[in-house]
């Protein structure tokens, strides 16, 4: 089951669905490809510090902290009860969580070896500015980002009868990219190292 989530100001921020813990065999198959690609690209960057922008309940942050206990890992997201409850469940000595918007990151230039935004940029009002901020705090390192691949994503929603009044648009998605247009956006901020297409997403590693 999925639910619409809102931040402390009442703005729709997304459609919460535990895709990482789903027992649905189709979702599990899709997520296996997604996580495998994510792990491979993260391995290419081999960062010793990570800022995860829009970390949600902290599932990925916690996974990375366990896999890389020597790395400093910071997760930021909006103030929302479900998000902070998730943080309490996903703790590790090398994890730090902060309530903060993606548009203005309270970190120094080049403070992190990698900045990630996994299924986040489709939600933010100014994605180009958010990417620029991420590139600033990861200067000399990498960005690792993923978004739904359009128009495939909306087509799949409509095929299963979801969000028909909004032509398949998932609640909270205010930005939409094909693989090509997303790579073009990121290439303005650094060198695209690799762009992958785990169905039905686009995932890109960028050297900044």
Model-derived segments and spans:
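Conserved class I S-adenosyl-L-methionine
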Residues: 144-166
């Amino acid at each position: 089951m999925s639910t619409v989530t809102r931040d402390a100001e009442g703005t729709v921020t997304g459609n919460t669905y535990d895709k990482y813990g789903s027992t649905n065999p189709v979702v599990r198959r899709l997520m296996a490809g997604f996580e495998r690609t994510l792990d491979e690209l993260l391995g290419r960057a081999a960062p010793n510090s990570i800022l995860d922008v829009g970390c949600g309940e902290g599932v990925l942050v916690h996974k990375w902290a366990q896999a890389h206990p020597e790395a400093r890992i910071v997760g930021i997201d909006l103030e929302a009860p479900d998000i902070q409850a998730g943080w309490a469940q996903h703790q590790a000595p090398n994890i730090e969580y902060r309530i903060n918007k993606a548009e203005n990151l309270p970190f120094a230039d080049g403070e992190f070896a990698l900045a990630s935004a996994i299924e986040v940029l489709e939600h933010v009002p100014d994605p180009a500015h958010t990417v620029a901020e991420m590139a600033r705090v990861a200067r000399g390192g990498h960005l690792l980002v993923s978004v739904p691949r359009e128009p495939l994503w909306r087509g799949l929603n409509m095929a299963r009868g979801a969000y028909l009044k909004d032509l398949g648009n998932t609640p909270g998605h205010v930005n939409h990219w094909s693989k090509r247009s997303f790579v073009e956006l990121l290439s303005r901020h650094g060198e695209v190292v690799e762009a992958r297409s785990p169905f039905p997403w686009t995932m890109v590693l960028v050297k900044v």
